[in-house]
Amino acid sequence: SVFWRPEDGEQTIRIVPTADGDPFKEFHFHYNVGKNPGILCPKRNYGEECPICDFASKLWREGVEKNDDTSKREAKKLFARKRYYSPIVVRGEESKGVRVWAYGKTAYETLLSYVLDPDYGDITHPENGTDIVLTYTVPGTPGSFPKTALKPRRRPSVLCDDDVADCDELINSIPEIETLFQRHSTSDVQVLLDDYLSSDVTSEGL
């Protein structure tokens, strides 16, 4: 898979520069809609109408008006959530090419603080950028979330050494992140929502 997930413990990654100069891609997804792994929100991503947003907002308002915690909880599950994606090289696995790392707001803010820090500057620069040490902690108790700690290396380094991997091939393997997700029209999203709601009603009726 082009997507990379950190493993428990420490690993070193390098964020790779993109053609448009922005290696931190932001997308909004709806989760918990049936068995769909994540639906791109037409409204938050593209400024189009989104039936899931409309339904979740209506559900939330009803929950507030009727003081119904169940409705509010269901609405929260359906609200669009923000995820960030960056092309990376995993040190020691350069031969696997450029992969895509998905992460949340906290990791994004940490990375941004390094980018804006003049001591580091452009951490993605191919000649004098900075590797990031990522420490991933798998949760020990059910219901808790994994933790991601990020720390830049003290010294800048080159993105790629030809002794380790074919650098031209590595750069050419940078995926266009926008193309990795299926974009649904408003009517497509309505169908997905209707399917989810009808299956939900059916399961409740059993």
Predicted regions and their residues:
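Compact mixed alphabeta submodule
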Residues: 91-206
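OB-fold ssDNA-binding interfaces and closely related basic DNA-contact patches used
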Residues: 1-122, 183-191, 195
